C-alpha cells in the first residue's frame, strides 16, 4: 500500500478489551430486542449501543485486515471465503435444518435465511474484496478508498454501503495508530462532544437495519430487517 510501512506489532490487550465490550453490548442489545421489551427501538441503552457497535466492529476488522490485503485478489478471495463465508453456510444449514425438525420457532426455518444470516461476515468479505480490487487497479490508497466507497454505494445487501467507510477508517487507524495514540485524549473528547450533540436527533428507527440506503430493490433476496438481524 503506497506511502505506508507495516509495523510488526505484538498482540494489543486494548483491542481484546475493546472487542469484549462490543460483544457484551451486542448481547445486551439482542436481549432487549428478542425478549420482547416494549418499544426497544426507543430504549436509551439500545439507542446508545446501536449508535456505534457495528461501525466499531467494522473499523476493528479493517484494522486487522491490513496484512491480509497484501495477498493477491484470488488468494484473498479464497482464504476469506473459507474463513468468513463457509461458517455462514454451515451455521445456516445446521440452524435451519434443526429448526425445521423440532419446530422450535417459526423463524429461521426458511432457506432464504441463508442470504441474511451472519450478515456481518458477508459484509466484511465484500468490503475486503472491493477494497482489494480498487487497490489492485490504482496502487494508491486514497484513490482506492474513493473507488471502493463509490462501488459500495448501491450495494445495500448486508449493509455494505454503510459498512465500507468504517472498514477504511480501520485501515487508516492502523497506519496512523502512533498519531492516534498520541492524540487519543483529544480525539475521544471531540468524538464524545459530537455524540452528545447528535444524541437528541438519534433514534432506533434511524439505524441502517430499519432505513437502509437503497438505490434499487433486491426484494427476492431480502430478509425481514432488524427482526432477523444478527447484530
Each predicted region: which residue ranges?
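Alpha-helical transmembrane segments and their immediate juxtamembrane cytosolic regions
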Residues: 1-231
Amino acid at each position: 500500500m503506497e506511502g505506508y510501512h507495516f509495523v510488526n506489532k505484538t498482540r494489543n490487550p486494548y483491542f481484546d478489551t475493546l472487542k469484549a465490550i462490543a460483544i457484551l453490548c451486542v448481547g445486551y442489545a439482542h436481549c432487549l430486542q428478542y425478549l420482547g421489551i416494549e418499544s426497544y427501538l426507543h430504549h436509551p441503552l439500545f439507542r446508545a449501543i446501536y449508535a456505534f457497535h457495528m461501525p466499531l466492529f467494522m473499523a476493528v476488522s479493517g484494522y486487522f485486515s491490513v496484512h491480509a490485503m497484501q495477498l493477491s485478489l484470488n488468494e484473498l478471495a479464497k482464504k476469506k471465503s473459507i474463513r468468513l463465508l463457509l461458517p455462514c453456510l454451515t451455521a445456516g444449514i445446521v440452524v435451519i435444518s434443526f429448526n425445521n425438525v423440532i419446530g422450535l420457532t417459526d423463524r429461521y426455518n426458511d432457506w432464504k435465511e441463508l442470504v441474511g444470516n451472519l450478515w456481518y461476515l458477508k459484509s466484511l468479505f465484500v468490503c475486503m474484496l472491493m477494497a482489494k480490487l480498487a487497490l489492485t487497479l490504482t496502487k494508491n490508497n486514497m484513490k482506492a478508498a474513493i473507488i471502493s466507497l463509490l462501488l459500495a454505494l448501491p450495494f445495500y445487501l448486508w449493509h455494505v454501503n454503510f459498512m465500507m467507510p468504517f472498514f477504511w477508517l480501520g485501515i487508516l487507524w492502523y497506519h496512523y495508530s502512533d498519531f492516534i495514540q498520541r492524540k487519543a485524549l483529544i480525539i475521544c473528547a471531540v468524538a464524545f462532544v459530537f455524540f452528545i450533540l447528535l444524541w437528541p436527533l438519534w433514534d432506533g428507527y434511524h439505524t441502517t437495519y430499519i432505513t437502509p440506503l437503497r438505490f434499487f430493490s433486491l426484494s427476492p433476496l431480502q430478509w425481514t430487517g432488524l427482526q432477523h438481524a444478527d447484530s
